[in-house]
């Protein structure tokens, strides 16, 4: 559902698989200045901060991980584009948490592009919306909010009517490709 590409300065001496990336990142965040050692022939990473904190995080069997493609990812088409500011992203994620809403829709109607957090299976669902741009197109691109766990920042968002979206972080060399839900619609 989600593929991330990042260009980093650190050297990683070997390939390894992480089954639960959010859990791994949260483990790393337990240290304010972590030192992560994956250089040994062990089946785990040593995550430490001086002598005060230490964690052993086991790698996953690579056969249970869906590997990214060897070729560079690209959208089949760029049908809708908008900028998603850091504050807007924070409000969307916070409203989803506060209201207990599982869905995010990027909706084009009445000349505007808006992000709507709701429960699409419930006709009487509360919702929260943020306008992020203008459009002359009509569409509803749907995501599960659980797939929108992005590193904080401003994103240039491009969405293809072929049910794939690209979120490019303008602060880092970081791109997410996120699959849309199959009930998304685009009238152009």
Model-derived features with residue positions:
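Long, charge-dense
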Residues: 62-79
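DNA polymerase processivity clamps
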Residues: 1-58, 77-188
